[in-house]
Amino acid sequence: MAQSIIRTTKAPALALTPTQFSQQHFDLLNQQLRIYFNTVDAFTSTLSTADGGSSLSIPHIAASDSTDQIATGNDIPTVINFNTLDSGLGWTLNAPGSATAGFSGVYTIRYSLQFVNTANAIHNATVWLKVNNVDLANSATSFSIPARKSVGVPSYVAGYSEATFEINSGDEIELYWATDLAGDPTTPTDGVYIYHDTAQTVPYARPAIPSALGSITFVSRL
């Protein structure tokens, strides 16, 4: 279904009134006002429909990451990477994964992290937000990842959470995580890490599994 386009309105530069009545000037003035009010009507009627919100452009960002993410060490805070901008307006994605706000407002951030545990015991991971490299109060969430099923068969948990908070233009937002046992599939070292996988065709076709998915959406002005 095609989306309606909102066209902004601008007051016309009305023709100057002559010292004496002029039918030509009167007709021109009516024409200018008619065009202007038609534009205003089109603007308000588009917004007042059931799908009026679909015509608006709202600040947002959505990003993902296509790599395994390894904690720096046991119980050491580590930044979460996002290497792919999936969609964005009014935000900038910076390497290795922070996002900078272009507009002030109240925003909601949502994320999903594909945790893997290759160890033979349950282990925990905690995720939280930083704004301008300062921990955001009440933004942490803990996840418990079960012990592996067997050697070479890890357990998986999709760690999801969200938070709503105020952001000023220019603020830099980051996700951090830590785990009590940092795993590394390249060593290999048993423990917890954030897992990714490419798309597959067998035994069934499916898309790639990002290690991290995140989005920030505008809720309200400050």
Model-derived features with residue positions:
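Short, intrinsically disordered N-terminal pre-domain segments
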Residues: 1-23, 220-222
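Alpha-helical interaction segments
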Residues: 16, 23-27, 81, 101
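Extracellular jelly-roll beta-sandwich "head" domains, especially the C-terminal globular C1q domain
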Residues: 2-4, 34, 45, 49-222
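Long amphipathic alpha-helical coiled-coil
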Residues: 23-37, 41-44, 48
